[in-house]
């Protein structure tokens, strides 16, 4: 099987890169092992939410993105943003904003500055882009609605309205609000309640999407809101897009917002579904449930890869993109004495002091502090080409969280790195 580009990994980075290449006429295949991290994400994308802390103290929140991305080069020279340069990072971020608008991902935000989004526990987290159905505030501006009702679903334990309501008013942007909490009684979900394992956001949305009792649900929301101007709901309404949520908003005449629940997350799944539909509609091929095993090299180039399901057939391509993610997606593997990338056996780097073969450098003694192993990943250059045995391979690129040299959890930049490197690599391949 021969392609122009073979992409390993079907998450945010892999799909974004594939779409950009397919739009320009390249023939791409994505080898997708299973659910990606985006399926468990909040739906909000972060470009850079916090600056690194050299003393493991509190990280400074980022508001002005350009200023802080530029400053990042001095503190983390191996960060993908530092290698690409602030100008290119912001340009690729803006390219993704345009792509998101084209795909109707319904995202709000800009590269000018971060906004605050409300979490499922009632705290605020910085974000670059958020679904327009999620409650957000800009800086210290007060939330525009004074009376808020936080409504859960009776018997659904992955969203706790009382806890959210109590925490919400502790934020300065919501201290003027009157926040109440309650539960929706939805009889159509009684069948799911018999098995707690099935009472999850995905199952709920699948049942409700048929709108068998849509008017009853509208009435229940209005009555439970008790005169509130805004209603916060768990993200359980609409599996593939926001149409169901929009219909509820129009019918109730209320400012309805949805909040991410415990994984799996509908907000993240919607984005992955829409990205995949776009990739396939452009003629891209998705090989689902398969995983890349190893590669064959010719000099400083990758000739082909082998996969688990296609044992007797090689996948050849002019260029290869490694978008396999970090430990969560098995893009990186840790054993007792080493951390490695399993397909190409690429060189591994991390933050200063990290050594992939010295387990004692992987962690620090305080559990809640940023851990050095979280910065592990493959080494790249300014073109995102992957390093192996000290040399950069000319037709192998890395995108997303498989890249090393930064801690995405600490800095709040995982999805930003994913889309920025994906679009940068697409440009590199198209320029050949």
Swiss-Prot record:
Keyword Oxidoreductase annotated: yes
Alphabetized InterPro entries for the sequence: FAD-dep_OxRdtase_2_FAD-bd, FAD-oxidoreductase_2, FAD/NAD-bd_sf, G3P_DH_GlpB_su
Record-linked Gene3D superfamilies: FAD/NAD(P)-binding domain (3.50.50.60)
Origin superkingdom: Bacteria
Catalytic activity: a quinone + sn-glycerol 3-phosphate = dihydroxyacetone phosphate + a quinol
Alphabetized UniProt keyword annotations: Flavoprotein, FMN, Oxidoreductase
EC number: 1.1.5.3
One GO term of the biological process aspect: glycerol catabolic process
HAMAP family, per database record: Glycerol3P_GlpB
Family that this chain belongs to: Belongs to the anaerobic G-3-P dehydrogenase subunit B family.
Name of the protein described by the UniProt record: Anaerobic glycerol-3-phosphate dehydrogenase subunit B
Protein species of origin: Haemophilus influenzae (strain 86-028NP)
Gene: glpB
